[in-house]
């Protein structure tokens, strides 16, 4: 029986009270018996939490009571057991490290494409303007190895800070194409899409909600394998079930993705 509700969410929004907010969120999460990781930075919030459904939803409702997070969108999945080992709330320079301070998603984001539209484009082999689709995987190499979109571009980066120089080396590859950046839940592809537009690449979109939202809305069409996740479930299938529910992969201790977690 799938009793544990897992949520992933992020929002780029200015936060100037991180130390106080950290204690508040930690106390509330612990009181509700939740486990997982919350990252706070001046640029926003990034969280992965799991617990009993009522407890998770109570926490999210409390978070949305803060005007900064009123429109926070969550992605849900279920598991038979708690995939995290403890509850962590961390303060970071960035909620997803890129080491590119000029990229400020809270000040404006690149346009997005939703899952049904992307599936339709992939079905027909081009976007609505007739341009070829270039799917760009912005995740780390070991995540890509678990599964990705068919024909997606994979630069074999080992951490997200390698994305900017990789982009400079390959920017000419995107001429005349519609580029769709994607990642697990949307956070990395949001920064990646902004950087590509600032580098002068035209027709750049980000996959809204990432792979997990795509799975939720259209399943595994044009996708092979599973989606790596940074918790004890290891990976999620296109039906959002855990492929390795009993795997011994460690629970996420730093979803900043800079720890070099290996399979």
UniProtKB/Swiss-Prot annotation:
Reaction(s) the record says it catalyses: uridine(34) in tRNA + AH2 + O2 = 5-hydroxyuridine(34) in tRNA + A + H2O
Enzyme class: oxidoreductase
Coiled-coil blocks: none
Top-level taxon in the UniProt lineage: Bacteria
Keyword Nucleotide-binding: no
Functional summary from the UniProt entry: Catalyzes oxygen-dependent 5-hydroxyuridine (ho5U) modification at position 34 in tRNAs.
UniProt-listed PANTHER family: RHODANESE-LIKE DOMAIN-CONTAINING PROTEIN 7-RELATED, THIOSULFATE SULFURTRANSFERASE/RHODANESE-LIKE DOMAIN-CONTAINING PROTEIN 2
Protein name: tRNA uridine(34) hydroxylase
């Amino acid at each position: 029986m799938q009793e544990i509700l897992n949520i992933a969410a992020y929002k780029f929004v200015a936060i100037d009270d991180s130390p106080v907010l950290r204690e508040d969120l930690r106390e509330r999460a612990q009181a509700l018996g939740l486990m997982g990781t919350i990252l706070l930075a001046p640029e926003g919030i990034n969280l992965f939490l799991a617990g009993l459904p009522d407890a998770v939803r109570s926490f999210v409702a409390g978070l949305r009571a803060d005007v900064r997070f009123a429109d926070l969108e969550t992605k849900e999945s279920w598991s038979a057991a708690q995939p995290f080992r403890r509850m962590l709330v961390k303060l970071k320079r960035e909620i997803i490290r890129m080491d590119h301070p000029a990229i400020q998603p809270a000040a404006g984001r690149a346009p997005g494409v939703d899952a049904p539209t992307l599936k339709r484009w992939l079905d027909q082999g081009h976007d609505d303007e007739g341009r070829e689709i270039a799917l760009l995987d912005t995740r780390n190499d070991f995540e890509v190895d678990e599964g990705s979109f068919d024909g997606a571009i994979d630069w074999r980066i080992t951490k997200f800070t390698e994305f900017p120089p990789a982009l400079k080396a390959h920017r000419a590859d995107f001429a005349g194409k519609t580029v769709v950046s994607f990642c697990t839940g949307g956070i990395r592809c949001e920064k990646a899409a902004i950087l590509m537009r600032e580098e002068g690449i035209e027709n750049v979109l980000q996959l809204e909600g990432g792979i997990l939202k795509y799975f939720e809305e259209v399943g595994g069409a044009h996708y092979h394998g599973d989606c790596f996740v940074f918790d004890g479930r290891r990976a999620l299938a296109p039906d959002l079930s855990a492929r390795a529910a009993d795997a011994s992969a460690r629970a996420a201790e730093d979803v900043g993705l800079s720890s070099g977690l290996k399979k």
